[in-house]
Curated annotation (Swiss-Prot):
This is UPF0229 protein mll9637. It holds the Pfam family DUF444. InterPro entries: UPF0229. It comes from Mesorhizobium japonicum (strain LMG 29417 / CECT 9101 / MAFF 303099). Residues 54-103 are annotated as: Disordered. It comes from the Bacteria. Keywords: Plasmid. The keyword Signal does not apply. Belongs to the UPF0229 family. The keyword Calcium does not apply.
């Protein structure tokens, strides 16, 4: 039967076991509190420590007790100096409001629990994932990772395992009874002591015997090396093929003049949430940021979120830039390719047909998943309730949505819509995204 010993150190002033047990019990309450903050527009504050209030009544430990309605018990109730048999006990006094008077009973106030940044992100993104991250038909695997596979008797000098080598050397010296230096030093001292005494036949005979023994031990010591080539061990590494699960996410954001500050703010909040999700849940995920007006270009993270450049609107330039980067840096045989696009739906006349052509003929054949988010006015959310109504880009993308199952499109009208839309796009169950 395996025995697992948890040797992790407790955080400062905390009990790790109790903390994890509480997180399991209060998981749903904690997730609800975090999501309420995000719906209120606090996405930028998600990547930090949080103080979450939890009702105290939900934190009690379950206990076993006697059933007062059954069984037979004998007990003695203590007397008192205030009441006699038959007296009525008055109700406890209270104030004029809804609260109760001061007393010694247990309070039902909220209890505040501090969650670390890692715990917040783990709870928030617990049931989300990139769809179809590992391809079903993997092509030839070209990348390998060295993995420790024990020891070998030959190898490169840089891979010598000193500990295992000295262990083998020590065992061999014991087995072959290699003389120790202390034994030779002891015989040499005896010879020196005898030579200091007056010479006699017995002393000379004893010195000759000791010299012969010393010579024999030295010869044996030279024959049995301290470290023999047979002792040397090298760390052995076997090449382990890496699964073809590298992923790249293309973030395409419209920053043209038609996108006002409100629309840009909602788009940036969506991409902040996406960026946190990718960096927290996946170790090897490249993120490519593309901003576009009438021109599109790849930018760094800071420029993507904070640059103020504006201009006309030609959405197809962003799709063309994405296709160019895929051909240059991300072979489809080695990468899972994803894309998320945010725009207000305004586009140059005739360019929406070009977008359909790029998606149908090129990008959708390369992408595992493509998500389009359209930023609309809150009043438009009531007018464009049906998916077939909307901007020219929305109507054009509707044709793509009906043809490609790995294409999804949603609308965002207010900060409170960001998280529900994000969950619909990246829910763990693929069928929920279509039905949502």
């Amino acid at each position: 039967m395996p025995i697992f010993i948890d040797r992790r150190l407790n955080p400062k002033d905390k009990s790790l076991g109790n903390r994890q047990r509480f997180l399991r019990r209060a998981r749903e309450e904690l997730k609800r509190s975090i999501r309420d903050k995000v719906r209120a527009g606090g996405i930028a504050e998600l990547d930090r420590e949080h103080v979450v209030p939890i009702p105290r009544k939900g934190t009690g430990e379950p206990t076993f007790g006697d059933d007062k309605e059954s069984g037979r018990r004998q007990h003695i109730l203590p007397g008192n100096r205030t009441f006699s048999s038959g007296d009525l006990i008055p109700k406890p006094g209270g104030g004029g409001g809804y609260g109760s008077a001061a007393g010694t009973t247990e309070s039902e106030d909220d209890f505040r629990f501090v969650l670390s940044r890692e715990e917040v992100l783990d709870l928030f993104f617990e049931d989300l994932e990139l769809p179809d991250l590992v391809k079903l038909n993997l092509k030839q695997v070209l990348s390998f990772k060295p993995r420790r596979a024990g020891f070998a008797a030959s190898g490169a000098p840089t891979n010598i395992n000193v500990g295992r080598t000295m262990r083998n050397s020590h065992g061999r010296r014991i087995a072959l009874r290699r003389p120790k230096q202390a034994e030779l030093d002891a015989i040499a001292r005896q010879i020196a002591e005898l030579e200091a005494k007056p010479a006699s036949a017995l002393v000379r005979e004893r010195i000759a015997a000791l010299r012969e023994a010393l010579d024999r031990l030295e010869r044996r010591r030279k024959r049995i090396a301290y470290v023999d080539p047979v002792d040397i061990r090298f760390n052995r590494f076997d090449p382990q093929p890496l699964p073809n699960a590298n992923a790249v996410m293309f973030c395409l954001m419209d920053v043209s003049g038609s996108m006002g500050e409100r629309e840009k703010d909602l788009a940036k909040r969506f991409f902040v949430l996406l960026h946190l999700f990718l960096t927290r849940r996946y170790e090897r995920t490249d993120i490519v940021f593309i901003r576009h007006t009438h021109l599109a270009k790849e930018v760094d993270e800071h420029t993507f979120f904070y640059h103020t450049e504006s201009g006309g609107t030609v959405v197809s330039t962003a799709l063309e830039e994405m296709h160019r980067i895929i051909e240059q840096r991300y072979p489809v045989a080695e990468w899972n390719i994803y894309a998320a696009q945010a725009s207000d739906g305004d586009n140059f006349a005739g360019d929406s047909e070009r977008c359909i052509e790029l998606l149908d003929r090129k990008l959708m054949r390369l992408c595992q998943y493509f998500a389009y988010v359209e930023i609309i006015d809150e009043r438009e959310s009531h007018i464009f309730g049906a998916t077939e109504n909307g901007t020219s880009l929305w109507r054009a993308y509707n044709a793509v949505d009906g043809k490609w199952p790995n294409f999804q499109m949603r609308r965002i009208a207010a900060p409170a819509d960001i998280y529900p839309v994000f969950r619909q796009l990246f829910a763990r169950q693929p069928d929920l995204r279509k039905s949502a």
